Design a protein with these regions (language model features):
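NAD(P)-dependent Rossmann-like dehydrogenase/reductase catalytic/cofactor-binding core
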Residues: 1-206
Length: 206
């Protein structure tokens, strides 16, 4: 059971990314429409908590562990359980992802893991500042990069993470919790839907 996985991801790219890592770790990934009774159900959701993700993908919550694909898996891995996840499934997932010496954190059920929630909210706040015309996109990124020592500004960071992906994270967190803190800014929503850069300023009306 520790080496048999059933994957559920948001995209073909995510499926391939996770499959390559699991192959390197020595896990066997099952094919077919339904997981076998002994398989660990590994889900890589954006924005959802593990319970919602297990329900959406139609897998057994007792055998479900979620993994965050938003961040660099070569540096750290975050796993999330449902309230029903069996201890042996949690232990199997942790042992597998720690097999190559990379650090693994296991968290309880929560919308957006940790990194997804923090990064989406930081980018969304920067988008809201741009929408309010407090500063230009370039100035927002420069202020954060130079003032806080970030490697890149939040809008550039949002572009690298994917505006559409961040929109999905925020919308799902808002849907599950009802918390208005997760409401996507108009700046983010419009650019995500149009496939535009978050650093693209509004056109002049003159």
């Amino acid at each position: 059971p520790a080496n048999t996985m059933r994957l559920a991801t948001e995209s073909a790219d995510d499926q391939q990314k996770l499959a390559v890592l699991l192959d390197a770790l020595g896990a066997q990934v099952e094919e077919g429409d339904r997981p076998s009774e002994q398989a660990l159900c590994l889900i890589a959701p954006y924005g959802d908590d593990a319970t919602t993700a297990a329900n959406r993908f139609g897998v057994d919550a007792a055998r479900t562990v979620c993994v965050d694909l938003l961040t660099d898996l070569s540096r750290h891995r975050t796993l999330m359980m449902t309230p029903a996840t069996r201890p042996d499934m949690r232990a199997a997932a942790h042992a597998l992802f720690a097999r190559d010496g990379v650090g693994v954190t296991v968290i309880r059920d929560s919308v957006g893991f940790v990194a997804q929630r923090v990064l989406a909210m930081v980018v969304n706040l920067a988008c809201d500042i741009a929408q309010q015309r407090i500063a230009s996109p370039e100035d927002i990124d420069q202020a954060v990069r130079l003032g806080l020592g970030y490697p890149q500004g939040p809008l550039a960071w949002g572009d690298s993470l994917g505006p559409r992906r961040l929109l999905t994270i925020l919308e799902r967190m808002l849907n599950v919790t009802g918390d208005p803190r997760y409401r996507p800014s108009h700046w983010l929503r419009r650019r995500a839907l149009l496939g535009l850069s978050l650093r693209l300023d509004e056109p002049s009306t003159i």
